[in-house]
Amino acid sequence: MPLPSRASSTPKISKACVPCRTRKIKCNAAVVGLPCGSCVSRECPDECVLSARKRRTVKGRNAEVPRSRKNIPDTNGSILSPRQQQLPTNVSRQTTDSSHSDPVEESIHASHTGSSLRNDTPHSRDRRPPGQAQADLLYLNILQDTVNDTSAAQTDASDHQSNDEPDDSFNSQIHHWNPPPQLDDVDNEYLAKKKVFELPPPRFMDDIVKAYFDYVHPFAPILNRIDFIQSYRSGSCCIFLLHAVAAAASLYVTHDVLIGCGYPDRSTAQASFFSKAKLFHDFHCQGDPLSMLQGSMILGAIILDHPSDRDFQYWFHNSVRRASKMGVQNACLRDDGSQKLYRRIWWVLHNRDIFHFFINTQNMRLLANAPPIRPLTEADWETEDIEQWSGILSPISQAQKVSLIAQCELAQIFGNVMSVVTSSNPSAEEIHKRILPLDAWRTSLPERMHLMASFAEGEIYHLEALTTSYRFECIMCRLLRRGRWQMSDGGLREWAQQRFRSAIFELDTIVKRVMINNMIQKLPTTFITTITALLALHIESALDAAESSLIRSMARISVQHTMLALDQIRDTPAIKRALPAFEIVLSKNKLYPMSTSDTEQINTMQTMSQDQALSDGHILQPPQTDMTLPQDDQSFLYGDFIGFDFLDRWQMEQLDFTGIY
């Protein structure tokens, strides 16, 4: 059956598109127009363009480029997304639009989806080389390799000649045999009713974007800030990515912004944005591959106030899948303008891969066999001119760059430690050797981040990095002293016990310092989840009969301080979800006064904790409680507090928020 032709709507094309020329494969753009069948089959139609020197606009591609925001009508003060403008018509790739995009918008859109045409094409950076096709089935993979190997020998002249031949491209044939799913009118109507294609009013959306770049992006710089702002302003930004950004930033915007967006609190706002992004993803409303990857990575760092099957583990796996499919690890090796962005993306994924495995060794390392790339440096950030966007973007500081670099180094240190402790015959000497660089790493941070003596904004990145390091040291030492890896060396367990207590003390100090400087609400989710893990460790120590009375008393005092910290961020969805579970545990064991009448007692314990001891040398003793628990409740003492297994034993819903690093 003859294939549908789009040539009638396009001018005569006498050469292959840029991606096909780069890959040295046949291009049927002369027959079907742009995007060609090869680019469509690889799900990268936005990358299908002619060489930049042609300087002409192909009408067939105009239907793929969203209109500028200035042409988008305002509905109840909300911005309509580019996709919503096409409703209720079908959104298949064959649908044409009579409107034409401004060439400037096309260049901005192309820049956001990969890079400008002045450098190598996004396809040449993001995609695997011709021997590594992306077919899902083995036989298709083999056939594609055969076709690509044959086509690779062709010259540009043969490419030019093949453009006038009938469409016999293997990739195009695969696309027509197995077309991607399309949304029908019912799907479009459902998504429209869910307001998936709508964004908050522009003035509030600007506040959300600014909050994202101020409080979220510095710890995971997976966006090219200038490209994102340009595509956002032009209205061509992927709606999935925008909803993901809004979900992450909803923790940091003011209450007035939440009200202006139509949400009464942070939990409702975050859940709404998260749900819209999830629907966009589940209905296969595909944006460009890079935006889908970035959005998945952002959603992978979000914890809702209720359980979800699409938790951070799901989005992390999805991010790795998309990154591998795009060939991000190969793009990191190229020397072009987009290399910096892809290197940062790959290192963020690499860090998460190690930390997810470190938290729970039952998790599989997804990137363990990935080819190594050179370490991240300060040169891996773009040189930006943000004067035009100064109302949204702030300059990137030295501390922000060093923060991610330090996280990468930390991941390498703990990755080396885990390779030893999980080996068949780990030795104490080897563990000591692998953990030794951690102390030097911590000592070097203040100088590398150019910190001042007084508490400044840059101190946030320093404290966040230290918090992550002490948290994972607690995890490792706690498991070592509990014999998790069958370590029979008594000296090693004593060493692990000492380092565990020192790390707990440092975490307590950091939390208090952040509270005193009123900075706790500006810290990322990774810091917030560390506070919950810290509280669980204090509860464990307070209820551990094997601990001395001194340790148990100090743990009880620390519980009060940690609960005060959580109270400062109780409107955060992750904490809102955790507090009821903690309150049940604490109330059941009389570790925390739950009534307002006990406020004075809390303040007294805070004052006494500063001096550590009374004037007569005795440690402050909490009210006597019956430490004998029912048999059903004793079992949680032997569970993993970091994973909150003890809550499962009380038939509480599983809380996965400590799993996020």
UniProtKB/Swiss-Prot annotation:
The keyword DNA-binding applies. The keyword Transcription applies. Pfam families: Fungal_trans, Zn_clus. Transmembrane segments: none annotated. It comes from the Eukaryota. Fusaric acid is phytotoxic to plants such as cotton and banana. It has been shown to induce programmed cell death in plants. In addition to a mild toxicity to animals, fusaric acid exhibits acanthamoebicidal, antioomycete, and antimycobacterial activities. Keywords: DNA-binding, Metal-binding, Nucleus, Transcription, Transcription regulation, Zinc. It is found in: Nucleus. One of its GO terms (biological process) is DNA-templated transcription. Its main location: nucleus. GO terms for molecular function: DNA binding; DNA-binding transcription factor activity, RNA polymerase II-specific; zinc ion binding. Induction: Expression is up-regulated upon exogenous application of fusaric acid. Disulfide bonds: none annotated. Residues 17-48 bind DNA. Residues 57-131, 151-185 are annotated as: Disordered. Residues 73-98, 110-119 have a biased composition (Polar residues). Signal peptide: none annotated. Residues 99-109, 120-129 have a biased composition (Basic and acidic residues). GO terms for cellular component: nucleus. Transcription factor that is involved in the formation of the two Fusaric acid derivatives, dehydrofusaric acid and fusarinolic acid, serving as a detoxification mechanism. PANTHER family: FARA-RELATED (PTHR47171:SF3). This is Fusaric acid cluster transcription factor FUB12. It comes from Gibberella fujikuroi (strain CBS 195.34 / IMI 58289 / NRRL A-6831) (Bakanae and foot rot disease fungus).
